[in-house]
């Protein structure tokens, strides 16, 4: 019994720790990319080429005294950052890298439901702070996240229609002859832009305007709890880019040795994440009405039409005689 518990704990840790290490170094990559795009050097003091900067930042944040507003809800104020990071790590469970921790039959639905639950951590953190600025920021963030989840769900449904299964492992078999990005490129473009909005990245970073005096829902957070929110945000960025690679650029595990699969997937994830950083360095922030107009007036009708199109394709092909 004890051995079984130890094995399960080791498996969970071996899954979570590499994600957290990757997240830590993604922050360094972001700072380096932004600095070079602004013609400056970026972090280069702590360690060789600044490689130990994420470690120094983490140590500094976690040894600081966590300041809590006197009027806040104490339990919920501390619980929400923990919940945010827990959900950000848990959502990786069904991803085939090339083997998933748990091969779920409804893996894509699990991803959708877990990403929807992440909204509660934002809402509760804004409410628990007992600050009107934090609450307004949280409500704005929740509205943005829920809105763009509609598009993501419809795009996922279209991909499911083409792959014929809710499991993520099937996508490797589906994309063996051709990547789905070639046959569904309008969906892939809208998916990528929607993931930018879903993860609250520039130019959709209305949730957490770092250049503003009041940054958003996490304005009252400092030290350790703030670091947990930060880790959760970057873990979600890594997750969304890994999911994009699996959905539209999946290297087929049937033709590759299992050792090469994670390397190729990680390379594609890094390139997609670099796109996120490039966009942040290049584009100004959207106005809130433009953000909502883009989704409800542009993306939603397009994704609904394409979903109907992709639903009709398998039915149409099933009616074609085999000799044609």
Curated annotation (Swiss-Prot):
The chain crosses the membrane at residues 9-29, 75-95, 106-126, 142-162, 177-197, 228-248, 259-279, 300-320. The keyword Transmembrane helix applies. It is an enzyme of class 7 (translocase). Its main location: mitochondrion. PANTHER family: NADH DEHYDROGENASE SUBUNIT 1 (PTHR11432), NADH-UBIQUINONE OXIDOREDUCTASE CHAIN 1 (PTHR11432:SF3). One of its GO terms (molecular function) is NADH dehydrogenase (ubiquinone) activity. This is NADH-ubiquinone oxidoreductase chain 1. It comes from the Eukaryota. It is found in: Mitochondrion inner membrane. It catalyses: a ubiquinone + NADH + 5 H(+)(in) = a ubiquinol + NAD(+) + 4 H(+)(out). InterPro entries: NADH_UbQ_OxRdtase_su1/FPO (IPR001694), NADH_UbQ_OxRdtase_su1_CS (IPR018086). Its EC number is 7.1.1.2. It is a multi-pass membrane protein. HAMAP family: NDH1_NuoH (MF_01350). Core subunit of the mitochondrial membrane respiratory chain NADH dehydrogenase (Complex I) that is believed to belong to the minimal assembly required for catalysis. Complex I functions in the transfer of electrons from NADH to the respiratory chain. The immediate electron acceptor for the enzyme is believed to be ubiquinone. GO terms for biological process: aerobic respiration. Keywords: Electron transport, Membrane, Mitochondrion, Mitochondrion inner membrane, NAD, Respiratory chain, Translocase, Transmembrane, Transmembrane helix, Transport, Ubiquinone. The gene is MT-ND1. GO terms for cellular component: mitochondrial inner membrane. It comes from Struthio camelus (Common ostrich). Belongs to the complex I subunit 1 family.
């Amino acid at each position: 019994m004890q051995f079984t518990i130890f094995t399960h704990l080791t498996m969970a840790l071996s899954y979570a720790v590499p994600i957290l290490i990757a997240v830590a170094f993604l922050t360094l990559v972001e700072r380096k990319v932004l600095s070079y795009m602004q013609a400056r050097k970026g972090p280069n003091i702590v360690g060789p080429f600044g490689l130990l900067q994420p470690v120094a930042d983490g140590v500094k944040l976690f040894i600081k005294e966590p300041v809590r507003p006197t009027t806040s809800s104490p339990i919920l104020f501390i619980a929400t950052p923990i919940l945010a990071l827990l959900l950000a790590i848990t959502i990786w469970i069904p991803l085939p890298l090339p083997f998933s921790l748990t091969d779920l039959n409804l893996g894509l639905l699990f991803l959708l439901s877990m990403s929807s639950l992440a909204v509660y951590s934002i809402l509760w953190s804004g409410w628990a702070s007992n600050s009107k600025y934090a609450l307004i920021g949280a409500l704005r963030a929740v509205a943005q996240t829920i809105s763009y989840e509609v598009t993501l769900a419809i795009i996922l449904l279209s991909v499911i229609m083409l792959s014929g299964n809710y499991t993520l492992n099937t996508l490797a078999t589906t994309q063996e002859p051709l990547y789905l990005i070639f046959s569904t490129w309008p969906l892939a473009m809208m998916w990528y832009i929607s993931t930018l909005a879903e993860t609250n990245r520039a130019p959709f970073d209305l949730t957490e305007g770092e250049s503003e005096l009041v940054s958003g829902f996490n304005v009252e957070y400092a030290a350790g709890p703030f670091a947990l929110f930060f880790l959760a945000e970057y873990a979600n960025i890594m997750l969304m880019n890994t999911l994009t690679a699996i959905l539209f650029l999946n290297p087929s595990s049937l033709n590759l040795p299992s050792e090469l699969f994670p390397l190729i997937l990680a390379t594609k994830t890094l390139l997609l994440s670099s796109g996120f950083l490039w966009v942040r360095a290049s584009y100004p922030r959207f106005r809130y009405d433009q953000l909502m107009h883009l989704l409800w007036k542009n993306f939603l009708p397009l994704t609904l039409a394409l979903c109907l199109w992709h639903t009709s394709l398998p039915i149409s092909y099933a009616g074609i005689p085999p000799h044609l």
